[in-house]
Amino acid sequence: MERNSLLVCQLLCLVARAAATSTAQTTLPSTVNSTATGVTSDSYQNTTTQLPASSSAAALSLPNASAVQARSPSSFSDTYPTATALCGTLVVVGIVLCLSLASTVRSKELPSDHESLEAWEQGSDVEAPPLPEKSPCPEHVPEIRVEIPRYV
């Protein structure tokens, strides 16, 4: 069981590392000025923010307005990338948990009826402990002792 928990932790760490190292994508409603003429169009724009190459710069750099493509979101994953990643992570974790539970249940094998019958016929069963001399029942309750003979 400890091995399964370790695998789940490693999987979660991999997903967290992948989410932290990917570029942050945000879909924002904005007004894009495609040329210097002042013509604007209201739409959604998919903006990628990147850290600048120089470590002395403190602000985030955004792409040029002329390089930004104005488009409408086409799917759920384009509109909500974080929610899509979270749903994918939950699905993967659920599958891993189901597989680990299935392997745990499968590892606890019970002997088949044939094996237990052979063991009983050979007499390798542990004998039952003797009954106590004094019954744990209260005195007003009658005691009934029954011995079941064992045929060999």
UniProtKB/Swiss-Prot annotation:
One of its GO terms (cellular component) is membrane. It is a single-pass membrane protein. It is found in: Host membrane. Its main location: host cell. Pfam families: HCMV_UL124. Keywords: Host membrane, Membrane, Signal, Transmembrane, Transmembrane helix. The keyword Transmembrane helix applies. Residues 26-47, 110-140 are annotated as: Disordered. Residues 1-20 form the signal peptide. InterPro entries: Cytomega_UL124. Residues 32-47 have a biased composition (Polar residues). It comes from the Viruses. The chain crosses the membrane at residues 85-105. Belongs to the HHV-5 UL124 protein family. This is Uncharacterized protein UL124.
